[in-house]
Design a protein with these regions (language model features):
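Short coil/loop residues immediately preceding or within conserved phosphate-binding loops
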Residues: 16, 39, 59, 72, ...
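Alpha-helical interface subdomain recognition
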Residues: 1, 74-76, 90-93, 99-208
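Cytochrome P450 core scaffold surrounding the K-helix E-X-X-R motif
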Residues: 51-55, 86-91
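Glycine-rich phosphate/pyrophosphate-binding beta-alpha loops
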Residues: 8-14, 68, 104-108
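Flexible, small-/acidic-enriched active-site or ligand-binding loops
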Residues: 50-80
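Short intrinsically disordered coil segments
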Residues: 35-37, 60-65, 88-97
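A short core secondary-structure module
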Residues: 4-57
Length: 208
């Protein structure tokens, strides 16, 4: 089996030894190439034990304006040799297998959003107790207290969505809807919490 094509936005590719790739048979009728049943999932070795890239694979790191704790790359594959045993699951079922994986990945994204919101909340509340204006900490002002309350409320809602969805996954319950709604809410709420934290901290919130 020879794998050809490109894979964009692969997280931590620089540090990964393997990747999962969903691909179709190049010999398929072009009119059927978008058919979901034509995609299969493959286990692709990225590098050997010495760290050398697999022949036929090259990668380019992408520069991002944020999320710099992990690298993101674009991969190029040209006649990468795979064996039949590298097929993951059932041939032609790769798309549906990926969709099932996405349910767990959505939960991971929710947990990341929750963590970012909690960090912003901690920084903002600490600053509100330390920054003194007109003889008292700004946290004594009702507007700041309202901001902190709103942030806390959203974080608790985010945490409940994460725990509820994780509990369902652990108990083998379907989470197609829960994981999608959780990702939507947690991503939106995390942005709102971080934005509010910036308002509480003022200009200092924009510094490193």
């Amino acid at each position: 089996v020879y794998l050809n094509g490109n894979k964009s936005f692969m997280t931590n590719a620089v540090n990964s030894k393997y990747m999962l790739c969903v691909a179709r048979n190049a010999a398929d009728d072009p009119s059927l190439r978008e058919n979901r049943s034509k995609f299969s999932m493959w286990w692709v070795p990225l590098r050997d034990d010495e760290g050398n890239l697999t022949p036929g694979i090259s990668m380019e790191p992408l520069e991002k304006i944020g999320w710099n704790m992990g690298n993101t790359c674009e991969l190029h594959m040209e006649d990468v040799v795979l064996e039949e045993k590298d097929l993951v699951g059932v041939e032609g079922n790769g798309f549906m297998q990926a969709m099932v994986n996405f349910e767990v990945e959505r939960l991971i994204a929710c947990a990341q959003s929750l963590g970012a919101a909690e960090c912003a909340f901690e920084d903002a509340t600490h600053y509100a107790t330390q920054r003194v204006q007109f003889g008292k900490p700004i946290g004594k002002n009702q507007l700041i207290q309202e901001h902190i309350t709103e942030m806390y409320m959203k974080i608790e809602n985010m945490r409940n969505w994460v725990y509820k969805t994780a509990w369902k996954i652990d108990n083998g319950e379907p989470v197609q809807i829960d994981s999608a709604v959780a990702k939507l809410y947690c991503g939106r709420a995390a942005f709102e919490v971080c934005d509010t934290a910036l308002q509480v901290m003022g200009g200092i919130g924009y510094t490193k």
